[in-house]
Regions:
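Residue-level signature of catalytic and energy-coupling elements of molecular machines
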Residues: 30, 48, 138
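Alpha-helical transmembrane segments of integral membrane proteins
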Residues: 24, 34-44, 83-299
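Hydrophobic alpha-helical transmembrane segments of multi-pass integral membrane proteins
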Residues: 40-47, 147-150
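Transmembrane alpha-helical segments of polytopic membrane transport and secretion proteins
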Residues: 1-42, 285-299
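Residue-level signal for helical boundary/lining positions with a hydrophobic bias
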Residues: 29, 56, 78-81, 261, ...
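Hydrophobic alpha-helical transmembrane segments of membrane transport/permease proteins
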Residues: 3-9, 41, 49-84, 234-247
Length: 299
């Protein structure tokens, strides 16, 4: 499929139309990427099913039934039950809401704050850039899991704590990307022209620089969603994240710490493990697809 459509004309027979916009070209390239399309479909399905979880859940996710302990999948319990007789399918849906809430919220906060910090550093330069750059370097060297475990012990593990701490540890990546883009754009002629005619700094940043930084930041955001979901699941598995009776995919995997469960009760750990894998792989595929679609070398 050509990026330029040819339409019949009255004089020459063929008249080239206006070339497709960069956005349309990027979308076209994204839709030609099978992995990115499959990842998008999978992610949308998981998110939609999780959101309507309270409607389609056959049981309360926290309802205990000691007469149904560790029952295999059946017509009554589609994915079986856990060690206290709770329905695994209902817990999977409820846990998905928590895991996705943490993943998307942490990524959104990190991208918003990181973009702001990076744009400020790149635009003002000098001591402002030096201070923010040193903070970014320090934050990138901090072991995230260790910090969250320590804070969970001091503050107490909770969903808001996870979102804030994960976002606080993740913002340097989008900040570094935004800073690099602004540094490369601030000396461009269109930016200098805007400054020469007296445009306010806020207008220049919002109109010219932030839009230029958005494509790579969107790619970073999709990867941050995957990292945040994976980090929340790891922490909940270790007991430093979401706490029972509230469910998350991570603390559902906590049930699979014995060889007996691993070998003979796969319904307890395969569903949450599969959901984590689907979200992480889908987000990474989408990020790769967006990166390839906006790559200037493909124009």
């Amino acid at each position: 499929v050509s990026d330029r459509d040819i339409l019949p004309g009255p004089a020459t027979g063929l008249v080239p139309t206006v070339e497709a916009s960069p956005d349309k070209l990027a979308l076209r390239r994204f839709l030609r990427n099978p992995a990115a399309v499959a990842g998008t479909i999978a992610l949308v399905i998981v998110v939609v099913v999780t959101l309507i979880g309270p409607i389609i859940s056959p049981f309360e996710p926290t309802a205990i039934d000691l007469t149904q302990v560790r029952k295999p999948p059946s017509g009554e319990h589609l994915l079986g039950t856990d060690s206290t007789g709770r329905d695994v399918f209902s817990r999977l849906l409820a846990g998905g809401q928590i895991s996705l809430l943490v993943g998307f919220s942490a990524a959104l906060v990190a991208v918003a704050f990181g973009t702001l910090a990076g744009v400020v550093a790149g635009w003002f330069g000098g001591i402002v850039d030096a201070i923010i750059s040193r903070i970014i370097d320090i934050m990138l060297s901090v072991p995230a899991v260790l910090v969250i475990i320590v804070l969970a012990g001091v503050i107490g593990p909770s969903v808001p704590m996870l979102i804030i701490v994960i976002a606080g540890l993740a913002w340097p990546n989008p900040a570094r990307i935004a800073r690099g883009v602004v540094l490369s754009l601030r000396e461009e002629e269109f930016v200098q022209a805007a400054r020469a005619i007296g445009s306010r700094t806020r207008f220049i940043l919002a109109r010219h620089l932030v839009p230029g930084a958005l494509p790579p930041i969107v790619v970073s955001a999709t990867l941050l969603v995957a990292e945040s979901v994976l980090l929340e699941s790891s922490l909940s598995f270790l007991g430093a994240g979401v706490q029972p009776p509230q469910s998350s995919w991570g603390n559902m995997l906590n049930e699979a710490q014995s060889l007996t469960v691993l070998s003979s009760m796969p319904w307890l750990w395969v569903p949450p493990g599969l959901m984590i894998a689907v979200i992480v792989l889908s987000a990474m595929a989408i990020g790769d697809g967006i990166r390839d679609a906006i790559d200037p070398r493909k124009n």
